[in-house]
Amino acid sequence: MKSRLRLPILLLALACPALFAADAAAPRWNILFVFADDWGRYAGVYAGIDGKPSLNDAITTPNVDRLAREGVAFRRAFVNAPSCTPCRSSMLSGRYFFNTGRGAILRGAIWDSAIPTFPLQLRDAGYHIGKSYKVWSPGTPADAPFGGQTHAYEKSGRAPNNFSEEVTARVAGGMALAAARDEVLAQVRGNFDAFLADRKESRPWHYFLGVTTTHRKWVKGSGQALWGIDPDKLKGRMPAFLPDVPEVREDVADYLGECQAVDAYIGVLRARLEAAGELERTLIIVSGDHGMPGVPSGKCNLYDHGTAVSLVARVPGAKGGRVVDDFVCLPDLAPTFLEIGGVKPPAGLYGRSLLGILRSDRSGQIDPTRSWVITGRERHVENAREGYVGYPMRALRTADFVYIRNFRPERMPMGDAKTAFDPKVLAGNTLTEETRVGFADMDASPTKEWLVRHRDDPRWKRHYDIAFGPRPAEELYDLRKDPDQVNNVASDPAYAKIRGEMGADLMRRLTEAGDPRVTGDGLTFEKPPFAGPVIEESANEGSSKKASRKAKN
């Protein structure tokens, strides 16, 4: 009898080796991951952590805050690259963004299927996996690191990607605001329920909700109309790089409203977990792919406003109410999820597992070696500059300083002005609606338009220069004195020693990591396929394109 059982088991092991490779000591929790486009470090929990006036004073996120009370909030969580596709390439693989082939750029990205990613590795280790909306995009094939659309659950609807547009349209059609919101939230619930219903037996699962809600565009005035966020409450709380004027405050309030929509989605998913009896065996973790879009120092910048993100987790069986000061970079999530699933991480990872920190009962600095992160970017919008080239940057962030190396300071950081100053452009609201008119590495927005219109006003010229002006080869910011990173002290003799040390440390780490920007001839990213015109991807971007009406940048 035993010999007859051994043969089929042996054949199954040979056919599906990954199913038998899982570490028996691994927790094998379910993993619920909410990952929002352009969601920076904005949640109510951070207002208390920051300890000073900030934009977080104006946002209400009861569901994220509850996760933090029951789990852990990371004070120093950063993306590896503040641009959608390269950030996701890095996060999904656990590698530096510059080690992901054509995944290192935005427009023109093509996924290298030879690079392992945590969702597919979990699938091969016996997890039931599923996703709704955006995982990896723009790029070809869309969502390739998650298996494309094979594991998509979106039949209940895609309205959650465009919360303010969808709810505003329903209200304009005569629906009550509460009913309109509930109708959109029902689609989040329906897609997740369909995913859970598909699970075979009691297999562990991983679900990825990738909403584009917080990506522009959104409805002007929606922060107050839909969420009651008063733009005037932001007065005196704006960071130094943002003009503290009504137009910009309203724009920021609208963004915070979309962040609150993401919080509502998190609440829906948590409620479904409780109803299904799955809450206490599920890791819930929430974050975003970079900072605020369409504003100075945000998306596509290596200042904290561009690279710092929310990261909050509820961990089964762990102590809640913790705030961790360790530096965390989103590539750390891949080895974390793999360790939870009992999967051996592949070689070549930059990220390090956070499982020990998640299970710890301590706050503050837990791992003393987690004292820095590296961030960077290459090309974002392909035609932002003449020659279809990017604006290469790398940065080293520590507790007290941010050091930035701009490898091509002769280029414009947000792209060429193009027709941004054309009277015909300024006659309307083109800079609010069309990103590629000028400075294309900053999303179209009311803030962008306001800055361009006030570029010659002495009161606001510094804000304009921070947003669009040229930058030197080196930048250094003393966070103890300048938390908003607006006073570059790289040329100050008093900082010569720290500038030299951080510059050398950054270059050493990049060289050790095999960054093509600093190894070989250093020109890899200056040549096709990383530079030059992009042939428009066709059907390969299909689902992600359908999933959202947001711009693909």
What are the residue ranges of the model-derived segments?
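Structural signature of FAD isoalloxazine-binding scaffolds in flavoprotein oxidoreductases
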Residues: 479
